[in-house]
């Protein structure tokens, strides 16, 4: 199959999509964005066309090299294997395990508990409290872990997959008005990452589907 420009099905505010956008930017991969609005039309992810593409009806979804990949960490790992520069997983097995541990903690242990589909089930009056509790519980653990793994970034002094997970999750925390004062390590790493070009161009405020009032 002829492989053209990669296509990323993404929602500007999706933290999972943001992880992949950062990876694509870091690796210098040119791609086309197809916006999937998770709110408009009762959720465009529920359309028959998108469900045929991704049976889980979630973003991100990436078409690349003639295949379709779902789930942000699986996408990033594929990009790492096929386009390994710059490296997002350390060569050292112990550091690589730390990167995967932190990535899984965020992608599997924090974000799913406060995502849109869960908050809809909680009920409007409880959404903010629920999200704050989920993020705070996860950040309590993450702050402690980072104190032993961090250098300039989450694991040592090079940007890794863990950092791609951290920044979008801090943005979620800020959106849900979580007090970040108890998390100085998380906050300082996040601040250092946000000045990097790949994190800026992939930011939710600079996407094709970003509403005008949220653009920067």
From Swiss-Prot:
Matches recorded under CDD domains: GST_C_Zeta (cd03191), GST_N_Zeta (cd03042)
Record-annotated GST C-terminal domain positions: 92-212
GO molecular function: glutathione peroxidase activity; glutathione transferase activity; identical protein binding; maleylacetoacetate isomerase activity; protein homodimerization activity
Phenotypic consequence of residue 150 to V: In MAAID; decreased maleylacetoacetate isomerase activity
GO cellular component, one term: cytosol
Modified residues (N6-acetyllysine): 32
Known catalytic reactions: 4-maleylacetoacetate = 4-fumarylacetoacetate; RX + glutathione = an S-substituted glutathione + a halide anion + H(+)
Quaternary structure and partners: Homodimer.
Record's disease association: Maleylacetoacetate isomerase deficiency: An autosomal recessive inborn error of metabolism characterized by mild elevations in succinylacetone in blood and urine, usually identified by newborn screening. Liver function and coagulation are normal. MAAID is a benign disorder.
Name this polypeptide is given: Maleylacetoacetate isomerase
Gene source species: Homo sapiens (Human)
